[in-house]
């Protein structure tokens, strides 16, 4: 029962991930059909959250071993996180729609800077969904590196130097992500 809930949550995570990727693409090229698809996927994620939440609460009322009880508790929190990620797809879509409606376009530099941010978001979402699906704690521990690095770049103004930013961001990201796990992480 817990394994089924984990699998369904992984499917929910994938829908949220795809929705954000599609919504980000709408800031570059508006497409009414794709926009509707993003809305539909977000609605499906909401349905997953409702159904999984109900199922997990019922499951938690049963007598479970310690590991299953912890898994159910984690899943209850995780479905909310994935639902919030999916909500961001609609926020991105709404911004893209406003840009399309008002015929607002990014400058070349702004597009390059946005691409760095989008690449980082895609990397985080890919790692997050992959780590969750595989239940890989080592991979999950690497997810936080990318947003922290990106935040540091934004704070220091590096994000404003688009051509340098992309090269430096990827160099630092790859260096940080390639570090070997500590003996404690190896299990």
Regions found by a protein language model. Name each.
Residues 1-176, 180, 184:
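Cytosolic, long alpha-helical scaffolding segments
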